[in-house]
Amino acid sequence: MDQDAFILKEDSEVEREAPGGRESLSDVIGFLDAVLSSEPTDIGGDRSWLHNTINTPQGPGSAHRAKSEGEGEVSTPSTQDNRSGEESRVSGRTSKPEAEAHAGNLDKQNIHRAFGGRTGTNSVSQDLGDGGDSGILENPPNERGYPRSGIEDENREMAAHPDKRGEDQAEGLPEEVRGGTSLPDEGEGGASNNGRSMEPGSSHSARVTGVLVIPSPELEEAVLRRNKRRPTNSGSKPLTPATVPGTRSPPLNRYNSTGSPPGKPPSTQDEHINSGDTPAVRVKDRKPPIGTRSVSDCPANGRPIHPGLETDSTKKGIGENTSSMKEMATLLTSLGVIQSAQEFESSRDASYVFARRALKSANYAEMTFNVCGLILSAEKSSARKVDENKQLLKQIQESVESFRDIYKRFSEYQKEQNSLLMSNLSTLHIITDRGGKTDNTDSLTRSPSVFAKSKENKTKATRFDPSMETLEDMKYKPDLIREDEFRDEIRNPLYQERDTEPRASNASRLLPSKEKPTMHSLRLVIESSPLSRAEKAAYVKSLSKCKTDQEVKAVMELVEEDIESLTN
């Protein structure tokens, strides 16, 4: 009965108020809807929402939702983005003027009074808290220009700036981080939220301080399209109710206590990225945390006005790059790659140039470019060295092959020399007797195989040995070439000259001759002896005059004696 009386009292206040009083009525109805549709344990657990002002014209309505264990959804009509109600309002009432919407609202209130005979909590629950469409506009037009709730504010911001949503998708961040609280799934009638809890927030949120104009149907359609793409990212990590309020409570309390100018736009995306429960995606973002940033650091474009921190960080990065270059030069010097650190800084080699540029890089793109250049230059230098090594190996192989040819020819030449030496040794063994006699075992001296005429040694008749022709420098002289002093003694000079022509060679001894072979050989012995020229001529002349063998023997004995006297 108290609740019905409270509703009737509010209805009477609505009748006395101007048409602009619908804002307080919707707040009250949303308050009752929250009371009736939630369990007593949930209401007794957290009563922070009781302290929020309901009908204050300065701030927006309660901007938070609460979901109890996946059961009923508690939300204020001024902030709840009811999917079915939003679609029906956009599709059916986008062209309806605000006056008709206000008239329809009053008709719904009259219908509610007509059924006021039913008393008790059941009738109120059937009219207000059944979870369906109660006929009351849950999101009335913003006639007074009050700030919208946080969810709608972010939805319109994301619709106006679709590039922010593209950044979220490109960086792989969950949309709950930048897009604010999640919206219920449309497929289940708005009654379930897939286990995702709503993050409660204060009415004086940092993102809702700007005054927005009346939303256009295009913006609402953009919001609906954004919310329809939400189930594709349902697998992302949901925000837990234990961590989300703790991470956002400092900025909410700060803005709630200090206040902010009415022209303040929603906070930038970096505040949501740098929160405690989200991974640090941007490594090179050197912006200070939320608690240390001032209110005036965020202009309309979302970028900081004062570049002091960025300049300091840039100078710090340059100092770090310089120190890293010094460390790299020291390391290369210690490893023996370069002689000194000055060589690393002043070298014009491609690898060193790209290494210095990579160490001085200001962002990842430049560093990646320089590292790629470093790798390619190192690969090029290594390929060049490989080619040089191949050429060197080829030259070494050619020289080895030439050495093999030289060794082969030298070995063949050595074999020829060895065979020639062995043949000379065998010839020398034939000429000289190395004591192979069986009858003269006492004497150890070597006896020559060719014996000269001597008085002591006449035991063996000596025959002419043709091998004497090859001894020393003695050359074969033809038989019939006479000396000049013998010309006067030639009886028939024409006949002698005629016989000289065919015998003027070493092969003349093979031709038939009138002279006996023995006489011819004796003459050769005399000619090859070390006697003087006159003595040789005298002995040859006396030998030619011999008629018997005894005379020849006597002449040869005289020749041998003269030879012995010369040799001794």
Curated annotation (Swiss-Prot):
<feature type="region of interest" description="Multimerization">
    <location>
        <begin position="344"/>
        <end position="411"/>
    </location>
</feature>
<feature type="compositionally biased region" description="Basic and acidic residues">
    <location>
        <begin position="7"/>
        <end position="20"/>
    </location>
</feature>
<feature type="modified residue" description="Phosphoserine; by host">
    <location>
        <position position="68"/>
    </location>
</feature>
<feature type="region of interest" description="L protein binding">
    <location>
        <begin position="412"/>
        <end position="445"/>
    </location>
</feature>
<comment type="subunit">
    <text>Homotetramer. Interacts (via multimerization domain) with polymerase L; this interaction forms the polymerase complex. Interacts (via N-terminus) with N0; this interaction allows P to chaperon N0 before encapsidation and form the N-P complex. Interacts (via C-terminus) with N-RNA template; this interaction positions the polymerase on the template.</text>
</comment>
<feature type="coiled-coil region">
    <location>
        <begin position="364"/>
        <end position="429"/>
    </location>
</feature>
<keyword id="KW-0143">Chaperone</keyword>
<feature type="region of interest" description="Multimerization">
    <location>
        <begin position="362"/>
        <end position="432"/>
    </location>
</feature>
<dbReference type="Pfam" id="PF01806">
    <property type="entry name" value="Paramyxo_P"/>
</dbReference>
<feature type="modified residue" description="Phosphoserine; by host">
    <location>
        <position position="249"/>
    </location>
</feature>
<feature type="region of interest" description="Interaction with the nucleocapsid (N-RNA)">
    <location>
        <begin position="479"/>
        <end position="568"/>
    </location>
</feature>
<dbReference type="GO" id="GO:0003723">
    <property type="term" value="F:RNA binding"/>
</dbReference>
<dbReference type="GO" id="GO:0039697">
    <property type="term" value="P:negative stranded viral RNA transcription"/>
</dbReference>
<dbReference type="GO" id="GO:0006351">
    <property type="term" value="P:DNA-templated transcription"/>
</dbReference>
<comment type="similarity">
    <text>Belongs to the respirovirus P protein family.</text>
</comment>
<dbReference type="InterPro" id="IPR016075">
    <property type="entry name" value="RNA_pol_Pprot-P_XD_paramyxovir"/>
</dbReference>
<protein>
    <recommendedName>
        <fullName>Phosphoprotein</fullName>
    </recommendedName>
</protein>
<feature type="compositionally biased region" description="Basic and acidic residues">
    <location>
        <begin position="150"/>
        <end position="168"/>
    </location>
</feature>
<keyword id="KW-0693">Viral RNA replication</keyword>
<feature type="compositionally biased region" description="Polar residues">
    <location>
        <begin position="191"/>
        <end position="206"/>
    </location>
</feature>
<dbReference type="GO" id="GO:0019079">
    <property type="term" value="P:viral genome replication"/>
</dbReference>
<feature type="modified residue" description="Phosphoserine; by host">
    <location>
        <position position="192"/>
    </location>
</feature>
<feature type="region of interest" description="L protein binding">
    <location>
        <begin position="413"/>
        <end position="445"/>
    </location>
</feature>
<feature type="region of interest" description="Bipartite nucleocapsid binding domain 2">
    <location>
        <begin position="479"/>
        <end position="568"/>
    </location>
</feature>
<feature type="compositionally biased region" description="Polar residues">
    <location>
        <begin position="50"/>
        <end position="59"/>
    </location>
</feature>
<feature type="modified residue" description="Phosphoserine; by host">
    <location>
        <position position="257"/>
    </location>
</feature>
<keyword id="KW-0597">Phosphoprotein</keyword>
<comment type="function">
    <text>Essential cofactor of the RNA polymerase L that plays a central role in the transcription and replication by forming the polymerase complex with RNA polymerase L and recruiting L to the genomic N-RNA template for RNA synthesis. Also plays a central role in the encapsidation of nascent RNA chains by forming the encapsidation complex with the nucleocapsid protein N (N-P complex). Acts as a chaperone for newly synthesized free N protein, so-called N0, allowing encapsidation of nascent RNA chains during replication.</text>
</comment>
<feature type="region of interest" description="Bipartite nucleocapsid binding domain 1">
    <location>
        <begin position="345"/>
        <end position="412"/>
    </location>
</feature>
<feature type="modified residue" description="Phosphoserine; by host">
    <location>
        <position position="260"/>
    </location>
</feature>
<dbReference type="GO" id="GO:0003968">
    <property type="term" value="F:RNA-directed RNA polymerase activity"/>
</dbReference>
<feature type="compositionally biased region" description="Basic and acidic residues">
    <location>
        <begin position="83"/>
        <end position="101"/>
    </location>
</feature>
<feature type="modified residue" description="Phosphoserine; by host">
    <location>
        <position position="449"/>
    </location>
</feature>
<feature type="region of interest" description="Disordered">
    <location>
        <begin position="1"/>
        <end position="23"/>
    </location>
</feature>
<feature type="modified residue" description="Phosphoserine; by host">
    <location>
        <position position="125"/>
    </location>
</feature>
<feature type="region of interest" description="Disordered">
    <location>
        <begin position="38"/>
        <end position="320"/>
    </location>
</feature>
<dbReference type="GO" id="GO:0030430">
    <property type="term" value="C:host cell cytoplasm"/>
</dbReference>
<feature type="region of interest" description="Disordered">
    <location>
        <begin position="495"/>
        <end position="516"/>
    </location>
</feature>
<feature type="region of interest" description="N0 binding">
    <location>
        <begin position="33"/>
        <end position="41"/>
    </location>
</feature>
<feature type="region of interest" description="Formation of N-RNA complex involved in transcription and replication">
    <location>
        <begin position="547"/>
        <end position="566"/>
    </location>
</feature>
<feature type="modified residue" description="Phosphoserine; by host">
    <location>
        <position position="447"/>
    </location>
</feature>
<keyword id="KW-1035">Host cytoplasm</keyword>
